């Protein structure tokens, strides 16, 4: 009994030394509960990400495993090196951009697309090393940042509606309503409303519950075939190490690479600031302890993710759910990472999830991201016009890159045209000029 007590005390002492629990006003029990809470809110990514990357021709079961691995790697690294209650996983939005635009629309092999993700992550790492990252965040206006986030939300929402069959291609009107009497369409719609209703009632696992319910209904209707629940981890060699660095390192993909870098920069940095602020760890300027380590972990995780066959990795805003129940240290993130490792043994479940079960999650994420448009000053046309152009051009041009490009250019046009040149930061001017050069010298040929 004494030995057991000594072992327990030793374990608690180690946790105290590594995570400084008392200093942060928390306990190991609270951190574990927070980890479980965060995990339940974001575990949907292991089912949705393979569905999306499968569109690019990637092995969905292998992607399921690599999604678990990179989520575990990034989250555990964030916990151990930055001691923050922030979990990481492949970014929703950039995975859709990779699959539907870079691979499907542009016709590039997925290996080349992974190369573009790699170079974008390297760019992000260099911005972090040379401390340019926060300079860019501070100097790019809120309207453009909101426009980018909302545009990706509209793009994801459109992909969700398409995957559910709610909208279909129409040569005369571009899109039209699908067959709303089809059971697959109805299940996709049901899945979305399950998420929306449960989320509005503050149920953290809303997305996971929706995927489980719609998959079970699909099984009852004969769309899903039961393949078991637990198995040894399948091989991931069909996707690991297949990144094409040489094929992706060309001027024609400069816009795509820049888009991966810029979106990840805003997404991850914004989430880190938001979650640490909610945890009471950030100051009035948005800076938080071990910020440098957190930014390095974020960048390195994306580089690693491209090598093992998954899309850009980012900090997850769902981490705020763990913070809301008391998570304050990296122990929360480590618990999330360990749970993702356990999920690897549930790979048969990934093969059972039908496309319409994941569609509801896409539409819901689209709603969350598009809601940021409320932050735009709609009374100031020099701010609202660029935000609107950025947001709507992403789904209408079927390209996140073009939406970002037209947003930056239109921002400069509006400020110059109204004589408000002082509102233009060097960062915005440089980015706009880069996109103009891309349009003139690359896109025109």
Where are these regions (language model features)?
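Juxtamembrane transmembrane-helix boundary signature
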Residues: 2, 71-92, 122
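Helix-loop-helix hairpins and the membrane-proximal interhelical loops
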Residues: 2-62, 174-177, 208-292, 433-437
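Helix-loop-helix junctions within the multi-pass membrane cores of secondary transporters/permeases
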Residues: 11-45, 49, 70, 91-149, ...
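Residue-level signature of catalytic and energy-coupling elements of molecular machines
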Residues: 32, 52, 136, 205, ...
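Helix-coil boundary and interhelical linker segments in multi-pass alpha-helical membrane proteins
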Residues: 51-63, 101-112, 251-254, 354, ...
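Loop-to-helix transition at the N-terminal end of transmembrane alpha-helices
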Residues: 56-76
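Transmembrane alpha-helix interface/packing and boundary motifs in multi-pass membrane proteins
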Residues: 74-86, 196-202, 260-267, 298-308, ...
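Membrane-embedded alpha-helical modules
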Residues: 106-216, 220, 224, 334-445
């Amino acid at each position: 009994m004494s030995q057991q007590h000594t072992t327990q005390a030793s374990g608690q002492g180690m946790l105290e030394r590594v995570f400084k629990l008392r200093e942060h006003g928390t306990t190991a029990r609270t951190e574990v509960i927070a980890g479980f809470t965060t995990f339940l809110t974001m575990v949907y990514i292991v089912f949705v990400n393979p569905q999306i990357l499968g569109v690019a021709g990637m092995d969905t079961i292998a992607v399921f495993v690599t999604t678990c691995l990179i989520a575990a790697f990034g989250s555990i690294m964030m916990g151990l090196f930055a001691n923050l209650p922030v979990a990481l996983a492949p970014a929703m939005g950039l995975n859709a951009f990779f699959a539907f635009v870079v691979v499907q629309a542009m016709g590039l092999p997925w290996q080349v697309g992974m190369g573009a993700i790699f170079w974008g992550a390297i760019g992000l790492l260099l911005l972090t090393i040379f401390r340019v990252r926060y300079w860019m965040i501070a100097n790019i206006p809120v309207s453009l940042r909101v426009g980018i986030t909302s545009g990706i939300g509209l793009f994801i929402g459109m992909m969700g509606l398409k995957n559910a069959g709610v909208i279909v291609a129409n040569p005369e009107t571009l899109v039209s309503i699908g067959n709303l009497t089809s059971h697959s369409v109805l299940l996709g719609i049901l899945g979305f409303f399950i998420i929306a209703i449960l989320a509005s009632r503050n149920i953290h696992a809303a997305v996971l519950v929706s995927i489980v319910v719609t998959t079970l209904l699909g099984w009852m209707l004969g769309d899903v075939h039961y393949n078991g629940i637990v198995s040894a981890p399948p091989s991931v060699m069909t996707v690991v190490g297949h990144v094409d660095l040489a094929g992706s390192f060309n001027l024609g993909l400069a816009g795509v690479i820049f888009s991966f870098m810029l979106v990840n920069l805003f997404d991850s940095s914004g989430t880190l600031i938001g979650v640490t602020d909610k945890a009471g760890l950030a100051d009035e300027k948005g800076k938080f302890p071990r910020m440098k380590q957190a930014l390095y972990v974020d960048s390195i995780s994306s580089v690693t993710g491209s090598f093992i066959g998954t899309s850009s990795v980012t900090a997850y805003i769902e981490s705020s759910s763990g913070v809301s129940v008391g998570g304050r240290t990296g122990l929360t993130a480590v618990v999330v990472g360990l749970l993702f490792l356990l999920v690897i043994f549930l790979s048969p479940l990934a093969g059972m999830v039908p496309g319409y079960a994941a569609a509801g999650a896409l539409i819901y994420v689209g709603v969350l991201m598009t809601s940021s448009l409320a932050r735009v000053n709609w009374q100031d046309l020099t701010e609202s016009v660029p935000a609107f152009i950025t947001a709507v051009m992403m789904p209408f041009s079927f390209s996140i890159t073009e939406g970002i490009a037209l947003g930056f250019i239109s921002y400069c046009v509006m400020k110059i045209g109204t004589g408000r040149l002082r509102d233009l930061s060097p960062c915005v001017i440089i980015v706009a000029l880069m996109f103009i050069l891309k349009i003139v010298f690359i896109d025109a040929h």
